UniProtKB/Swiss-Prot annotation:
GO terms for molecular function: 2-enoate reductase activity; cinnamate reductase activity; FMN binding; iron-sulfur cluster binding; metal ion binding. The active site is at Y182. FMN binds at Q109, R230, R319, G341, R342. It catalyses: 3-phenylpropanoate + NAD(+) = (E)-cinnamate + NADH + H(+). In the N-terminal section; belongs to the NADH:flavin oxidoreductase/NADH oxidase family. Keywords: FAD, Flavoprotein, FMN, Iron, Iron-sulfur, Metal-binding, NAD, Oxidoreductase. It comes from the Bacteria. This is Cinnamate reductase. InterPro entries: Aldolase_TIM, FAD/NAD-bd_sf, FAD/NAD-binding_dom, NADH:flavin_oxidoreductase, OxRdtase_FMN_N. SUPFAM superfamilies: FAD/NAD(P)-binding domain, FMN-linked oxidoreductases. Its cofactor is FMN; FAD; [4Fe-4S] cluster. It comes from Clostridium sporogenes (strain ATCC 7955 / DSM 767 / NBRC 16411 / NCIMB 8053 / NCTC 8594 / PA 3679). FAD binds at A415, E434, N442, K452, A479.
Amino acid sequence: MKDQYKVLYDPIKIGKLEIKNRYVLAPMGPGGMCNADGSFNKRGIEFYVERAKGGTGLIMTGVTMVENNIEKCALPSMPCPTINPLNFITTGNEMTERVHAYGAKIFLQLSAGFGRVSIPSIVGKVAVAPSKIPHRFLPGVTCRELTTEEVKEYVKAFGESAEIAKKAGFDGVEIHAVHEGYLLDQFAISFFNHRTDEYGGSLENRLRFACEVVQEIKKRCGQDFPVSLRYSIKSFIKDWCKGGLPDEEFEEKGRDIPEGIEAAKILVAAGYDALNGDVGSYDSWYWSHPPMYQKKGLYLPYNEILKKVVDVPIITAGRMEDPELSSDAILSGKTDMIALGRPLLADAEIPNKIFEDKYDKVRPCLSCQEGCMGRLQNFATVSCAVNPACGREKEYGLKKAEQIKKVLIVGGGVAGMEAARVAAIRGHKVTLIEKNGYLGGNIVPGGVPDFKDDDRALVKWYEGILKDLGVEIKLNVAASKENIKEFGADEVLLATGSSPRTLTIEGADKVYSAEDVLMERKNVGEKVIIIGGGLVGCETALWLKQQGKEVTIVEMQNDILQVGGPLCHANHDMLIDLIKFNKIDVKASSYISKKTDEGFVLNTNGEESIINADSAVVAIGYLSEKDLYSEVRFDIPNARLIGDANKVQNIMYAIWSAYEVAKNI
């Protein structure tokens, strides 16, 4: 381990509680981790214990509701201590005792709830808020204003929940949140809070709710019981449901930095022992849940400001897994602790691996949010695109095979590599053959843009892991019925992937696939048409625009990003906003019919116009490569399709399907 990284393992205190190192499991939505009575289930316990086992010093649970009457949530959705305190203490004790066995501490994150950003599938179409304001997700729905008495009930519920948490063995609590536009944050922001009672008006009044919460907890649990606060110094709200991009000039409608500084001082003076800082809101979700289009360490400039104005530890998340970045952030005084959320979904052992000088063995988070936020927004259990066992560690972990088999895998894309990894871990003798001279499949062209560097890192990780596991890899070997039969495998997995759909345009010769352009096999010129406004088309357009090209997207649907996915809201919204911000022209409900001497002919709802361009780049989806399977299916009955060869889907389902099949060989 580099000397610089040693600071990541220095102890630190939150209040009087000592944490063994600087790593924090960032609190994340606990989908699938609780019982109907608000207590923790086995999945939830195993999830948090696994991260403690991986070396994280402070475990923070996902959001836990303090009550379920004022803002009634469908159960089971989130834990809640006050529904059945006895069961909560029983299951909580099992969790905290096991977490403590690894030398970690654990905080329970307590929440007042969602308010105007309530998830309809959880709360329904009735929402509460500080004032009568529009709902974030339900057009035409106005939130009910909470009464003064209800606010005071919330404060008492926070105190009661913290007492229960302390009895369950939690070392402290985190308050959720003067952050991201949740209910407590809505009270703190004048854009949302129009009240005239003691909880509205001045900044001090708008923060009264959050201040009374920490004071109530300290009164019940003792002044030494640590309480941290999830806090956003800036909201990045342009308007209702509209966020501001990096480097974009706009009028902040939420909390801006000067008020954020004053608010932080007031909150710390009220008794908060640490600030878990970030920026953003549900109106600018791509700040709170940063996609791959955001810079790594995006919160550091803002938390550095907090560090200078308050005297409590500052915790920073935001794509911070690289030890070079995280250690420098601490040494340069920008933060005190490093919170990892999604990276610890991808690999629970990041702190241990860095300590053991094995950072190259860390499975990278892609910031795709397909397995975490993408699933939570669809009311599914939390997991990870690149780690299928995440959130179901015990029931879905890998075990040694009872019978060792000879396994042949055809294709070295992500499905093939994952199947090889899983089969080898289970003890099988694995050979992987790949027709190209490299591994990675479609992720290789997809990983070309700078903002997709973690895709490239995933391929590199697989290469290293497969080598460590002793998988025999044969590149530049095309599979055939003859050489598969000659190999004599007990199991054959065909991960032959998918190939881009093609398109012929009358009169045009410079029509290229997005793959050929990304791999720099073709020169597109200076003016480019992208045919297809799905994920590949939009990301290719953004990449070309960053090179100074003039880019037009032509899409048959009525908007871009309508087909495929589903994408997490944050990724979807940021990509659309980046397309607009970068002045990439979008022609929706349109198609290119032909090319003439004047240019490409655009047909929009029956009306024709001309687009002058040097070339057209086709990104209209992929087709499964099933030819080999069709050829061998009757002669080699133990051959099975996996990944895109079985069904074209996103990277998560390619990996998950490969894991499932290889797990059961």
